[in-house]
């Protein structure tokens, strides 16, 4: 029997062998605080590739040093960082998967000794530092940094780029009226709040012709914040600019209580897919093969982003295949150990 979860998926000239994506998750493991890939990262990402994930996405990787969430985040702000990232893509490719990278700037959520930057001088909460409102010069420099990061991503061998526009980081801060109180061309109307992301996409398109994803927070969980319907319009603009897929997460723009349950964010992937007519990725408490297969069969999303479940077991695709009764092609090195992997957590 054929299963959609294990069917190929092609975006532009990149074909994924299945619909399982390793969701980008910060590991805070650049131990020398220099943004460099370490041996841990090579093992971490390489193992998920060997575990038969279709697309392995490297964690949020800072386009500028001051754009890191922590001082142990990965970076792509300098050419000296390309070699390490290329080792990671080689590990991933050699183990049968495609490689993606999430380009990011933490904005006001950067927990560093340096000043935090944001569209407006509003802290995330009472315990975090007051950010500095970005000047137009700083905005232009950041747009350029995303473009340069895209060039380095290509040189490092990545197949896919994802722009991190979610979880209350810099791009998300520009998009949301809760965090963007500017009175210039980067604030006010939805068109103006989208301008920063528009310029980033434009700049990346000048140097990158591969698949381009954007991760969004499709719900601010605040009465004065953005909802999924607001993101339909944002997504239509992204699609016009050539974005290929929207990775639909939610929250973390402002402190909020979120009702979390299995597949709680799938509704956003479905809504964006239906109303903006674009491919989407579903993410958030998707933990079984049957659940993932149902999402795809219901046409609620095109790709399944798996996060913590892949931290629990890097061989999640094998477990999902066993659960569904699908015979997954194994790495030849493991063929001497056929049979089921335990699904015990």
From Swiss-Prot:
The keyword Oxidoreductase applies. FMN binds at residues 23-26, 60, 102, 215, 307-308. One of its GO terms (biological process) is response to toxic substance. One of its GO terms (molecular function) is NADPH dehydrogenase activity. Its cofactor is FMN. It catalyses: A + NADPH + H(+) = AH2 + NADP(+). Substrate binds at residues 28, 164-167. Its EC number is 1.6.99.1. InterPro entries: Aldolase_TIM, NADPH_DH_bac, OxRdtase_FMN_N, YqjM-like. Keywords: Detoxification, Flavoprotein, FMN, NADP, Oxidoreductase. Signal peptide: none annotated. Disulfide bonds: none annotated. It is an enzyme of class 1 (oxidoreductase). PANTHER family: NADPH DEHYDROGENASE C23G7.10C-RELATED. Catalyzes the reduction of the double bond of an array of alpha,beta-unsaturated aldehydes and ketones. It also reduces the nitro group of nitroester and nitroaromatic compounds. It could have a role in detoxification processes. Homotetramer. Belongs to the NADH:flavin oxidoreductase/NADH oxidase family. NamA subfamily. This is NADPH dehydrogenase. It comes from Bacillus cereus (strain Q1). The lineage of its organism: Bacteria, Bacillati, Bacillota, Bacilli, Bacillales.
């Amino acid at each position: 029997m054929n299963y959609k979860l294990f069917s190929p998926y092609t975006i532009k000239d990149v074909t994924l062998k299945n619909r399982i994506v390793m969701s980008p998750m910060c590991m805070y493991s650049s131990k020398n605080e220099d943004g460099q890939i370490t041996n841990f990262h090579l093992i971490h990402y390489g193992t998920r590739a060997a575990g038969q994930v279709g697309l392995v996405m490297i964690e949020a990787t800072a386009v500028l040093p001051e754009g890191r969430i922590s001082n142990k985040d990965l970076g792509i702000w300098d050419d000296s960082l390309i070699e390490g990232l290329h080792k990671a893509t080689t590990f991933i490719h050699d183990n049968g998967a495609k490689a993606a990278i999430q380009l990011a700037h933490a904005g006001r959520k950067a927990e560093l000794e340096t000043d935090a930057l944001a569209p407006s001088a509003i802290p995330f909460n009472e315990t975090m530092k007051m950010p500095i409102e970005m000047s137009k010069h700083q905005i232009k420099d950041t747009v350029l940094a995303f473009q340069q990061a895209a060039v380095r991503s290509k040189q490092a061998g990545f197949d896919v780029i994802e722009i991190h526009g979610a979880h209350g980081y810099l791009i998300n801060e520009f998009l949301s009226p809760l965090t963007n109180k500017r009175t210039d061309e980067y604030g006010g109307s939805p068109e103006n709040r989208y301008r920063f992301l528009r310029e980033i996409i434009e700049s990346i398109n000048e140097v990158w012709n591969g698949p381009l994803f954007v991760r969004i927070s499709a719900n601010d969980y605040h009465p004065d914040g953005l909802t999924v319907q607001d993101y339909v319009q944002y997504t239509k603009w992204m699609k016009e600019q050539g974005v290929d897929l929207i990775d639909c997460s939610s929250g973390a723009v402002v402190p909020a209580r979120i009702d979390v349950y299995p597949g709680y964010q799938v509704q956003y992937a479905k809504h964006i897919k239906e109303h903006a007519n674009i491919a989407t990725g579903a993410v958030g408490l998707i933990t079984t093969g049957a659940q993932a297969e149902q999402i795809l069969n219901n046409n609620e999303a095109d790709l399944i982003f798996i996060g913590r479940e892949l931290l629990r077991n890097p061989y999640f695709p094998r477990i999902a295949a066993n659960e569904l009764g699908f015979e997954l092609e194994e790495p030849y090195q493991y063929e001497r150990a056929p049979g089921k992997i335990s699904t015990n957590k």
